[in-house]
Amino acid sequence: AYPHWWYGDTGKVKPFGQKDNGGDLVETAFIMQALLSVHQYYIDGSPAEQALAARIDKLWREVDWNFYRQNGQNVLYWHWSPEYGWEMNFPVHGYNECLIMYILAAASPTHGVPAAVYHEGWAQNGAIVDPHKVENIELHLRYQGTEAGPLFWAQYSFLGLDPIGLKDEYCANYFDEMRNLTLVNRAYCVRNPKHYKGFGPDCWGLTASYSVNGYAAHAPNERDDQGVISPTAALSSIVYTPEQSLQVMRHLYEMGDKVFGPYGFYDAFSETDNWYPQRYLAIDQGPIAVMLENYRSGLLWKLFMSHPDVQKGLKELGFSTVSKLSLIHIS
């Protein structure tokens, strides 16, 4: 698996934390989701494009998902280090941003995991199902450590994975669930219980981003709300809440160069603290472009869902979909 960070000029690992200096299976899943989409885009292209697709296929086949079961357990672990081994000790349970990791682990043609790893590890034998209301909006999944997580939980797994009509035994419709998670985030910001300046229907969206106090995972609860709006939160939600997200986009654009620069909207800001850092974070910028295109044409969803290994993995885990966008019907 790939590390969370590495130096582009040397290929050496840049530690994400003291003991997080090795493989990161979640970040590996995110890049593989992207690469499999690129593979499908180029697979029938020119000789050079087909050669690139072949290189991607080699990278895909080399990821050892099964190793991250830590001696054959029916759960996937987030980290492994050549120096510290399994000391990070982070078994991944749902729901959070990591759904795609379990799907790709089942989809791997070379180092795949059995369906029991998903059902016992991610879904914890059904404990992931937890019907509850937040901001008077219905949610049906258990969110790790909170009643409703930050918005990247509704986005990262679904940059390529098409949520429309996607279901399994734990969730009747992933699109509806993620839309409701987004609406919870918006409703919390509109209610604005901590009375931050600027929050409202035109300015909402809590997710992981820079903040006044460093990088933080902002979420719709008073503990995790620091008054920081991250444009990626609402903009990358455009597939779920097009009207509400466009309302935020127009408002942010009208705010001018305090929040908008040469590469689009800056990562985060706080009107309460008069904090406008004017800096970018790639993992926040990227989903904006991807989700805008998925909203416009469904392109990335179509590409990813068309990969035969992805279809195999979804089927093995018991997923079905009737999405008209992806044109792939799995039952």
Region spans (language model):
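Ser/Thr/Asn(+Pro)-rich, low-complexity disordered segments
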Residues: 1-327
